[in-house]
Design a protein with these regions (language model features):
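Short alpha-helix
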Residues: 189-201
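The AdoMet/dcAdoMet-binding core of the Class I SAM-like
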Residues: 43, 47-177, 185-186, 201, ...
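Glycine-centered, phosphate/nucleic-acid-interacting loop/turn motifs that mediate DNA/RNA or nucleotide
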Residues: 181
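Loop/helix-junction capping segments adjacent to catalytic residues or to phosphate/diphosphate-binding pockets
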Residues: 39, 73, 192
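Rossmann-like AdoMet
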Residues: 1-61, 81
Length: 232
C-alpha cells in the first residue's frame, strides 16, 4: 500500500491554502486548495524550459535573466547550470513561504539555488517586473524571461491568465527583452492561440513537448525578432 501524503507546512494565500506535502523520504507536492502545482517526480518540462532559454547565453557577458515562479527550484537550478558565473538571475515569487521551503525541506532538489550569489529573490508578481523593465527600457531589459507558473497560457486559466499571456502582456514581455532575447513559457497543453499571439508580437517560436509517452507538458521558446504586428 502506498504511503499517505502528510502536510509538512501550510500557508493561507489569496488563491487558497498553499500546502507542502510529503510522502516517504523523497516525494513532495506543492498544492493549492488541493490542486497539484508541483510534483517533485515530474520536473522534466521545467528543466528543459530553463535549459533551452539559457544555453545560448552561456558565453555572453552581463547576462540578466528573469524567472517567474520559484516552485521547488528545479527551473532556477537549470537556469543557474546554464548561465555564466557573472550572470544576474532575478526570481519573482508571490509567496514568501515558497522561498522558505526552498531553503528548508526542498533545498536538496536545487542544491540551495536560492542562495546562489547570482540570484536575487523578489517577492512580487512577475508581471509587475516585466512591466517595469518594458517601461524603463535600455539598462533594465533581460536576455531571457522564463515564465514557469502553474496556470499557463490556456484560455481557461483563472484570473491571472490574461494579463500574463494576453496581447498586451506578450507585447510587454517583448519590450522587456534585449535584442534577440528569449521569452520562455511553460504550458500545460499546446495552445495555438497563444503561439500565434507570440508570432504576431514579433517572436520566432519553437514549441517542444519534452519526454516520451504519458502526459507531456509544453514549453514555448520565443525569440525576439521582427517588429510587432500587434496594435496593442
Amino acid at each position: 500500500m502506498a504511503k499517505p501524503w502528510r502536510i509538512v507546512d501550510r500557508a493561507d494565500t489569496a488563491e487558497g491554502l498553499l500546502d507542502l506535502r510529503q510522502r516517504g523520504a523523497t516525494d513532495f507536492l506543492i498544492t493549492i486548495d488541493g490542486r497539484v502545482l508541483m510534483n517533485s517526480s515530474a520536473t522534466m518540462s521545467e528543466i528543459v524550459l530553463a535549459q533551452l532559454a539559457c544555453e545560448p547565453l552561456k558565453n555572453k557577458k552581463n547576462v540578466s535573466v528573469l524567472v517567474g515562479g520559484l516552485g521547488m527550484g528545479f527551473t532556477l537550478k537549470a537556469a543557474i547550470d546554464n548561465l555564466p558565473a557573472d550572470a544576474e538571475i532575478v526570481v519573482a515569487e508571490l509567496n514568501p513561504i515558497i522561498v522558505k521551503w526552498c531553503r528548508g525541506p526542498l533545498a536538496h532538489f536545487s542544491d540551495r539555488a536560492v542562495d546562489d550569489p547570482r540570484v536575487k529573490i523578489v517577492i512580487d508578481d512577475v508581471a509587475a517586473l516585466i512591466h517595469y523593465a518594458a517601461t524603463k527600457g535600455k539598462g533594465h531589459r533581460f536576455d531571457a524571461i522564463i515564465i514557469d507558473l502553474y496556470d499557463g497560457p490556456h484560455a481557461g486559466a483563472p484570473g491571472r491568465g490574461g494579463y500574463l499571456y494576453g496581447n498586451q502582456a506578450v507585447a510587454s514581455g517583448r519590450s522587456a527583452l534585449k535584442a534577440g532575447g528569449v521569452f520562455a513559457v511553460w504550458s500545460e497543453d499546446p495552445d495555438k492561440v497563444f503561439e500565434n499571439r507570440l508570432k504576431a508580437a514579433g517572436f520566432s517560436v519553437n514549441r517542444q513537448r519534452p519526454g516520451r509517452g504519458g502526459r507531456r507538458h509544453v514549453v514555448y521558446i520565443a525569440r525576439k525578432t521582427s517588429a510587432s504586428k500587434m496594435n496593442a
